[in-house]
Amino acid sequence: MHDNPRILEIAILDELPMSLVTEAIDFFNYNYPNDSKKQMNLGFFSSKLDHANPNGRGYFTVAIYDGKVVGTCTAVRKTLISGTNLIKAVEIGDTYTSKNFRKSCQFSQLYPGTSSADEYLNKSIFGRLATETLDRARADGVEYVYGTPNLQAKLSWLGRLNFKLVDGNFTYRISSASITHSFYASSRTLKAFGLVYTKITYLLCKFATNKYSMSLVSKHDLHQFPEPKIEATRKDCIQLLNSRSWIQARFVNNTAKEYKIVKIEKRANSQLCGYLFFLEHTRADDFKLLILSKSLFFDKQIERLIIPVSKIAADKFFKYENLSIWVDKRKNSIKYRALFGFLSKDFRVDIVGKSLKGEVGELELKNFYNFQYGDSDLA
């Protein structure tokens, strides 16, 4: 640390105290005029953080030196949809630090659980602001931050801040008031219209959404998967082994991610018939449908529905629950169709090859897809 570090204070602006918000706006306009000239005003912060956002009140934290704002961080409440599950999330944004305060700084109060002023959260403005902001979100039941980290901040999020990266396809509710804030902030009449509009889109969110592939970070520890208990008398049913049989695998089209794999054996003779894959960060109540080579394994929220091996041992078409499945060994692929009432969607997996050695597996897959099956997805 510098011999005479500048001492910073943390201020929480969730209730939007006028004086400090004005200081924050001045900070943006002075330090980042190109980024803030059209948006950084009181209406911008109000639409993100107060009750105008139907997803919930947001979070706003600033760092202060000598009465002036020198760093900011906001977290805007969002609602994501994954299958039939509503996920509480926040979008981190407006995380700016004065260029003159990125070194030789120290916070007046140690972060809870730390013991030294030289620890990261007691001297990094970015780390302290992000952590203080997300601590309050987490206390309100928020589990995820989406749209973060970008490439520049990724190492800090996943390294120093100890978050975990989770990939997935989520549906984003467009009901956030921030979409209309620039329109209705100019007058009370337009603001009232904007609030009505966001309430309507909130009710119709499932009909007015956009699809995004986004990165999520969660500081929560991974849930432990329960030991599966399968009662089966048919000899051609397959059995899940316990967690001691898990091994690690990597996919060549996504080498940065690790997946867990459970070995599947026939109950009658312990013959190996396939592997069940799931993301390392998948929750126990959020299983996915996964396909590999000749084997299809099917999990529906904790209740385990397993397709008998005999049904997928040869080239043929068959139906299982609301899935229509084609197995084509000649093309070394599986194609399946998920039915949504009158709608359907086709998925295909092309297998390039596989090599499993001992307790470490390496797979080569091309166009690997998965599809989440919830209680009402295929009703």
Regions found by a protein language model. Give the residues of each.
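Active-site/acyl-donor-binding loops of N-acyltransferases
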Residues: 2-5, 43, 143-199, 250-253, ...
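Conserved acetyl-CoA-binding loop-helix of GNAT-fold acetyltransferases
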Residues: 97, 102-137, 301-314
